[in-house]
Amino acid sequence: ETLCIYLKRTLDRKFHIRYPNRNEYMHSLFDVISALHNMNDFSILRFDFEDFFNTVSSEYVFNKYISKISLERFQIALFENFVTNTKYAYAGFNTSNILCEIIAKHFDEVLALKFKNHGLIFYRRYIDDGILVFNKRMGADLCISIINEAIQEVFFDKSIAVKYNCKTRLN
């Protein structure tokens, strides 16, 4: 447990992760929703990841993100040993939130870019749940297809060689 706390704090400092605040997100969403009645058309889509923590490969996150930041040799060795032994960001580990937030932050950036020209006016993700609001009618099938593209790009990068791949997908 002490090792997990140390690793989490190290990653918190290096990645400057801002953990989602559910209350803040809800207030922002309600502000947007209250303005929707003035719009001619809009769409709202909610999505969630299936069994999120248990599908994010800790080895993948290490190889794709953590190994690229400046860490001391002993820290790299600790992380390598940890991700080899844990395989996934299992719910309950102190490191699970940070590992998932590192990759999910990248997912958020990719998703926002993919929806940039589709009238996206609001997007927030709280851990494994996301909500998108558009200023025009957007079909659910198109939205889900674009979300799946972002998932493939972020969680299934073929250039990252790992023993345990991410299994992340929509519910």
How does the language model describe each region?
Residues 157-165:
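Acidic/polar loop patches that form or flank catalytic/metal-binding clefts of enzymes
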Residues 10-18, 69, 73, 154-158:
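A generic secondary-structure signal for well-formed alpha-helical elements
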Residues 2-46, 51-54:
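Active-site-proximal segment of RNA-dependent polymerases
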Residues 34-127, 131-146, 150-152, 164-170:
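Conserved polymerase palm-domain catalytic core
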